[in-house]
Amino acid sequence: MKIYAFADEANPSVDGQIAAMTRNGLNGLEIRGVDGTNVSEISLEKAQEVRAKMDAAGLETWSIGSPIGKIDIEKDDFQAHMDKFRHTLEVAKILGAKNIRLFSFFIPEGKDAAPYKAEVIRRLKCFVEAAAGTGIDLCHENEKGIYGDIAVRCLEIHQEVPELKAIFDPANYIQCGQDTLEAWTMLKPYVKYMHIKDALTDGSVVPAGKGQGNLPAILKDFQAQGGCQLTIEPHLAVFAGLKELEREGDTSVVGRYVYESNEVAFDAACNALKEIL
């Protein structure tokens, strides 16, 4: 099993992230925060600098933890977002990433998601078309507030856009009231990799195996079907950049467990996964 992480949760600097991955014996990075800047906004020169550091450390950039698709489907400019996606593709090529994580657009609060399905699918197909021939897989993550927040709508996405792979995030399903075993049964044929994040029914994030995510059972089945890549996404402490990941007005529920630093919280998340495996 190859284990990667959102190491920006340990340290905002690339050097600090490399140190955190190295001391925990990880294979590499799902890159998101780069010296305080989101990976989708760094220059190509900066991407080359990061690639050189990762290569020197013997680490791989497995996936781009991009914010693509995390815009309001009604209010925000999709063409500008497509430009950001094309730039993110160029960054991914330089970093040698095999995947780009993306989302299926925020649905206006209080509105039914169903009427937005056709537009969600159209936009996701635009991303697929732009990435064709690059050798980079586009991977949809289930997330609170987007079209693909619950399993049945994620299934629709993968049936309509078969080129998209799935990222299975147990904690995000719990925070949407979705049973994770039901979601896993529906979506496992589409899952390329998992985000290792667990939660309690009140939504608070806890170390892997300590919540209601059914991680031991799902991980066992994932391995049995040939799954061999995981990304640790701790969310056990407030870290630089957390606020930018949330929809305006939302807050992440962290802090059920208390850690003296982000580094300690990151190491705890790594150890929790190793205990399950």
Each predicted region: which residue ranges?
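N-terminal-biased segments
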Residues: 1-15, 40-48, 80-85
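Histidine-acidic metal/acid-base catalytic patches
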Residues: 1-4, 11-25, 51, 151-165, ...
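Hydrophobic faces of well-ordered beta-strands that scaffold small-molecule active sites
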Residues: 2-7, 29-31, 61-66, 100-102, ...
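Active-site-proximal loop/turn and secondary-structure-junction residues that shape catalytic pockets
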Residues: 9-11, 33-35, 67-70, 104-108, ...
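Active-site acidic/histidine proton-transfer and metal-coordination neighborhood
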Residues: 15-19, 53-56, 73-166, 175-177, ...
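Glycine-rich, proline-tolerant flexible connector loops at the mouths of alpha/beta enzymes
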Residues: 30-54, 104-112
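The substrate-binding groove and active-site-proximal loops of carbohydrate-active enzymes
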Residues: 70-78, 205-209
